[in-house]
């Protein structure tokens, strides 16, 4: 036994070492993905006996998981998504059974399409750039960077103040995120803006002192022409006081009341006086821009505060009508009109151009001479004069709504940090960041610069630069919305057989949609067995353009709990039920055929009752004759014994013999072992049908864990995360588990052989019971009884010890591997001796880390996880004890029953040995191959020794130079006759 065990241990050690290094190599080079997520020791309900698996997958928005290398102009390579692999399903590596519950949570943000510059945008319309308002000079659509794209600045669109109409800046779908900002007012410097349509930078002079600016300068004016800037007094400016002149020589002149009816003779001619008047001093609008803000209008959301009409200001009434030099003048009134507003209010009296007995106040006009609106917005509230609206049609129009929405700067805390330069000055300042939450599928965000409707906007000057970032088709945490494509963004799943790949199978599947709650959580029961595959629903049209334009990913956290497959139900029950049925059927058939029980055709069998009757008659006649002739003496005890024998044997001649054996003795004897084993182990052997299942229920826990638990495999592999010591732990534990498996299989083989032998012995019971009659055949009956009892007891004795040892093994196995396991960084790679070269701070810093199964909470830096070597040693001792107890129990039963001969233990051990040799033969590890190798090695060694001996002899007989032999024997003297 010891030699066989050593062979088994050697084989298991070699296999374990190979498995260890193979998995370590695979983990290091990343050739396979052994697992992911976590395998929990206990289910969420705190109970064991199930695989509670948690895992996380990354679900890409573009549904592309294959990268290819692309050569860049500088000679370097870059990984890019394979252009032919968009829109594919992702295997989550979560294997489920039918009706298995799965809990998941979707976390993350994705953008499922890319925003492009819309038609009729703030820079060009279809009327100014027919058919190309949204295309660059090369005819391509112009993409808008996403909000999360920190590597690219926002897209700039130039807004000219001459365009007095609503224009689009963004096409918005449901739940879109948009960030509209305005470039600053470039004061006393040049402005440079990237023209999105030309693809080049545009630079213009924006320094102060000018009256006309390009739109990129960040300032505009709606004023043009001239306005009255000051008032000047002019004497004798116009002919005023139109009246008659009086003839003083007639009736004392006009003062005597000469009636005008007398005409010229009385009153004289019509004449005018020469009067002074305040005349307008005009200057051009707008006045030159100044950086000090003296000519800049403050931000306001009231149009009455935005514009003051300077066109209608006059120093005096009718001042716009110049004197014609005639009497009377074209106008009769040139009295002061806006003099106080323009010139200032005189606290005394104006005498011509002098303020007598008073002072002149500051002209109110100075408070209204604000000709410029700037993107900075004087006062810092927003870009002055910029208004916006939402329009579902996206059409260009000039109509103003009754209520205007003026753009404002968002709070400083909401301004992106990358929108400032290194000095903290804003490169762009956000004016709109409101998510588009609407029931409409699509709408447009429009902007325009405010301009008085009474004026010709084509004479305006300047403008603003609007900048935009837009995250289109935005979804988060697995939520979906309808836009131009129904249910865009819904996470879908299909369950596919392990042998299928839905991306290449060509089959049509019926995806199931995930309706997550507000936290992104969803629960479902698998509708079939297989792997879960997932992807995000998106518009597949236009050659998968939306998939190709998508960006971002979801983290899908899985948790599922599946009861570990029962070794008893999946393996032992089918095996033993089939075996028992066949063996019991064969045994009963033997019995029935021996007695021709209910045989319709007696020619097919020979009724053994006939022989029993003949033997019984012969026995009675012979013994009666001997008794009458005095050859046989009989006492009372012997008489009773012989009558009992005759009674038992004669009972076999009854036609109901088979029913008696089948209903009372057969099941009682064959199930004797099962019932006792069940009582010893404490496991019920009865199923819902109240029939005995099998006696190996005590193996269910440990064998189910070993063969069907994914958690156990992960726990075992996690020992490798301890490095070199972990390899030793892994090999020892693997060997212990292997010994237990072999022992369990040997126990099953012993049970099978004992059960089969018992059934056969019961099947031929009529034959051996008839041997009870004669003394010279009595030993056959006695041996039949001994072997029947031996094969009934042998499984009981064997299982009694294995039950105890199995329970101990299960406990210690949980001591060794009783922890949750996660796939994570487990084996850090560090630079050796770095502490002698670099500062001590870098001593424990890994260069990179190899992912592997590692215990929950394990610190990969220290590599400690608290494995107790005592428990591992105890595990091996228990496994070794189980292996040896199988043969020990066979010897024990042989002594107890005094039945010499083959035992079920020996036969079962031979069966398991032959099976093991068959499994080892393909790799050359079976006994026959090893003996052949050993024999050939011994033969080669013997041949080598012979060759060496022959070479030594030849060397001794080789003559030296000069003809002498080396090591030659001295010549013998010649014999004398």
From Swiss-Prot:
Region (Disordered): 125-146, 918-977
UniProt main location, coarse: membrane
Taxonomy, superkingdom: Bacteria
Pfam families the record matches: TrbL
Cell location: Cell membrane
Topological relation to the membrane, as annotated: Multi-pass membrane protein
GO BP terms, alphabetized: protein secretion by the type IV secretion system
Biased composition range(s): Basic and acidic residues: 937-967
Segment forming the signal sequence: 1-24
Gene Ontology cellular-component annotations: plasma membrane
Keywords: Cell membrane, Membrane, Signal, Transmembrane, Transmembrane helix
Transmembrane segments: 612-632, 722-742, 754-774, 796-816, 833-853, 866-886
InterPro entries the UniProt entry points to: ATPase_P-typ_TM_dom_sf (IPR023298), Conjugal_tfr_TrbL/VirB6 (IPR007688)
UniProt keyword ATP-binding present: no
Family classification: Belongs to the TrbL/VirB6 family.
Protein name: Uncharacterized protein RF_0091
Organism field: Rickettsia felis (strain ATCC VR-1525 / URRWXCal2)
UniProt lineage: Bacteria, Pseudomonadati, Pseudomonadota, Alphaproteobacteria, Rickettsiales
């Amino acid at each position: 036994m010891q030699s066989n065990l050593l062979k088994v241990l050697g084989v298991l050690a070699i296999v374990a070492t190979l498995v260890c290094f193979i998995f370590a190599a695979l983990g290091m080079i990343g050739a396979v993905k052994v697992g992911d997520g976590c395998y929990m020791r206990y289910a969420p309900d705190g109970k064991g006996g199930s695989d509670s698996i948690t895992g996380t997958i990354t679900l890409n928005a573009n549904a592309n998981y294959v990268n290819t290398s692309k050569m860049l102009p500088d000679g370097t390579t870059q990984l890019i998504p394979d252009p032919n692999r968009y829109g594919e399903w992702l295997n989550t590596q979560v294997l489920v059974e039918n009706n298995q519950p799965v809990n998941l949570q979707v976390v993350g943000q994705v953008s499922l399409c890319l925003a492009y510059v819309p038609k009729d945008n703030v820079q060009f319309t279809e009327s100014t750039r027919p058919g190309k308002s949204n295309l660059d000079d090369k005819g391509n659509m112009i993409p808008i960077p996403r909000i999360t794209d920190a590597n690219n600045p926002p897209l700039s669109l130039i807004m000219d103040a001459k365009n007095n109409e609503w224009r689009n800046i963004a096409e918005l779908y449901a739940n879109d995120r948009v960030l509209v900002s305005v470039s600053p007012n470039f004061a006393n410097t040049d402005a440079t803006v990237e023209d999105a349509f030309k693809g080049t930078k545009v630079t213009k002079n924006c320094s102060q002192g000018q009256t006309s600016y390009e739109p990129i300068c960040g300032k505009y004016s709606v004023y043009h022409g001239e306005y009255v800037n000051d008032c000047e007094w002019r004497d004798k400016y116009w002919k005023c006081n139109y009246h008659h002149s009086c003839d003083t020589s007639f009736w004392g002149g006009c003062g005597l009341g000469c009636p005008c009816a007398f005409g010229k003779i009385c009153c004289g001619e019509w004449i005018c006086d020469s009067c002074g008047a305040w005349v307008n001093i005009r200057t051009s609008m707008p006045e030159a821009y100044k950086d000090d803000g003296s000519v800049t209008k403050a931000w306001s959301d009231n149009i009455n505060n935005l514009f003051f009409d300077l066109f209608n200001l006059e120093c005096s009434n009718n001042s716009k009508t110049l004197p014609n030099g005639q009497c009377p003048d074209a106008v009769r009134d040139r009295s002061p009109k806006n003099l106080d507003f323009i010139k200032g209010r005189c606290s005394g009296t104006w005498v011509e151009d002098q303020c007598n007995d008073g002072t002149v106040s500051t002209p109110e006009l100075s408070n209204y001479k604000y000709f410029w609106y700037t993107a900075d917005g004087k006062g810092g509230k927003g870009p002055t004069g910029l208004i916006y609206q939402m329009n579902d049609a996206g059409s260009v129009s000039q109509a103003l709504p009754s209520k205007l929405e003026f753009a404002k700067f968002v709070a400083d805390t909401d301004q992106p940090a990358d929108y400032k330069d290194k000095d903290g000055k804003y490169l762009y300042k956000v004016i709109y960041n409101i998510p588009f939450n609407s029931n409409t599928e699509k709408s447009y965000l429009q902007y325009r610069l405010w301009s008085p409707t009474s004026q010709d906007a084509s004479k305006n000057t300047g403008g603003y630069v609007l900048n935009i970032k837009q995250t289109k088709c935005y979804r988060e945490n697995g939520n979906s919305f309808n836009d131009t494509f129904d249910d865009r963004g819904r996470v879908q799943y299909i369950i596919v057989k392990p042998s299928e790949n839905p991306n290449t199978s060509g089959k049509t599947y019926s995806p199931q949609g995930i309706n997550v709650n507000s936290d992104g959580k969803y629960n479902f029961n698998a509708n079939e067995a297989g792997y879960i595959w997932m992807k995000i629903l998106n518009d597949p049209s236009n050659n998968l353009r939306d998939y190709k334009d998508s960006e971002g990913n979801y983290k899908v956290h899985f948790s599922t709990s599946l009861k570990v497959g029962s070794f008893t139900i999946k393996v032992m029950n089918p095996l033993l039920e089939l075996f028992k049925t066949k063996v019991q059927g064969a045994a009963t058939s033997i019995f029935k055929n021996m007695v021709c029980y209910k045989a319709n055709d007696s020619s097919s069998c020979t009724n053994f009752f006939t022989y029993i009757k003949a033997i019984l008659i012969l026995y009675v006649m012979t013994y009666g004759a001997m008794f009458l002739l005095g050859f046989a003496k009989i006492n009372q005890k012997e008489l009773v014994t012989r009558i009992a024998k005759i009674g038992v044997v004669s009972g076999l001649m009854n036609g109901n013999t088979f029913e008696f054996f089948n209903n009372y003795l057969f099941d009682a004897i064959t199930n004797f072992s099962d019932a006792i084993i069940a009582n010893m182990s404490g496991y019920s052997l009865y199923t819902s049908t109240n029939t005995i299942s099998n006696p190996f229920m005590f193996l269910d826990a440990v064998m189910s864990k070993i063969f069907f638990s994914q958690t156990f495999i992960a726990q075992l592999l996690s020992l490798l995360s301890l490095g070199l010591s972990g390899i030793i732990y892994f090999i020892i534990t693997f060997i212990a588990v292997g010994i237990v498996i072999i022992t369990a299989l040997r126990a099953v083989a012993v049970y099978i052989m004992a059960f089969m032998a018992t059934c056969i012995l019961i099947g031929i019971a009529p034959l051996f019971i008839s041997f009870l009659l004669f003394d010279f055949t009595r030993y056959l009956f006695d041996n039949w009884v001994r072997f029947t009892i031996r094969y009934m007891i042998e499984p009981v004795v064997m299982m009694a010890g294995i039950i105890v040892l199995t329970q101990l093994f299960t406990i210690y196995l949980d001591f060794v591997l009783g922890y949750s396991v996660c796939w994570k960084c487990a084996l850090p790679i560090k630079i050796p001796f770095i502490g002698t070269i670099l500062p001590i701070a870098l001593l424990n810093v890994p260069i990179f880390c190899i992912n592997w199964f590692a215990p929950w909470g394990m610190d990969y830096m220290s590599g400690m996880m608290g494995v107790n070597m005592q428990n591992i040693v105890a595990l091996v001792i228990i496994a070794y004890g189980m292996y040896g107890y199988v043969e020990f129990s066979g010897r024990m039963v042989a002594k107890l029953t005094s039945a010499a001969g083959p035992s079920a233990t020996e036969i079962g051990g031979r069966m398991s040995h032959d099976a093991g040799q068959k499994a080892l033969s393909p790799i050359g590890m079976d006994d026959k191959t090893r003996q052949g190798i050993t024999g050939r090695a011994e033969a080669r060694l013997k041949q080598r020794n012979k060759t060496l001996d022959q070479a030594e002899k030849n060397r001794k007989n080789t003559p030296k130079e000069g003809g002498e032999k080396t090591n030659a024997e001295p010549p013998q003297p010649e014999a004398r006759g």
